[in-house]
Amino acid sequence: WDTPWSYRLYKCLEQIQTEYVIFLMDDFILTDYVDQEEIEKDISYMENDKTIACFNYLPIPGEPEAIKYDRYMQMPKKTPFRINLQAALWRKSYLMKFIRKHENPWQFENWGSIRARRYSDKIYHLRKDAKRVFIYPDGGIIADERWHTEAAVELLKKEGYNIDFSARTIYHKGDARKTEIVHRTFIQKCWQVFKSLI
């Protein structure tokens, strides 16, 4: 596990032969059927417009620049978390272009959103009032190595999972998040930020 998360993701993507990939984190527990018809439509949109990088299947806060394909928003380039790790249909080559191999997931979302400002690739997010394509607890069921809210725990119990709270506690909104590797020196942190921005 010493290998950075984004390096492992990049190597995994290298082995996938398809032009498009559906990205789901391993703690996204689906609670309803997937809208396969919508995914197929989105693939056809991407085939007809090679500048579409991603259909992100979770709305993000902010005012859209435009509404596209009825149920998607095109957000301004400076929108925070315009690049994120929620359920999405990606053009594989574009996803690989956004990856920096030293980053953890939080850095990828933060710095990746800043990097994406340089590119003209189109990134669409589901409208807030649109039917969800993938239905799962927002943010997944794990947050910073803890159970992500009591609601996530209740979902697992409902599905028959026996939860050991001695091994993993519950994350509460407002708790500090462990998004940094604390043992790095100031110079190492600066170097990592530099690598993230190129």
Predicted feature locations:
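Short beta-strand-to-loop acidic/aromatic patch adjacent to the donor-nucleotide binding site
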Residues: 19-29
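A structural signal for short, well-ordered beta-strand segments and their strand-loop junctions
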Residues: 22-23, 53-58, 89, 123-127
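Conserved donor-nucleotide/metal-binding helix-loop-beta segment in metal-dependent transferases, i.e.
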Residues: 33-59
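Short, flexible, basic/aromatic active-site loop/helix in glycosyltransferases
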Residues: 65-80
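Catalytic core and acceptor-binding pocket of nucleotide-sugar-dependent glycosyltransferases
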Residues: 83-147
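Membrane-proximal basic amphipathic "stem/tether" segments
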Residues: 157-198
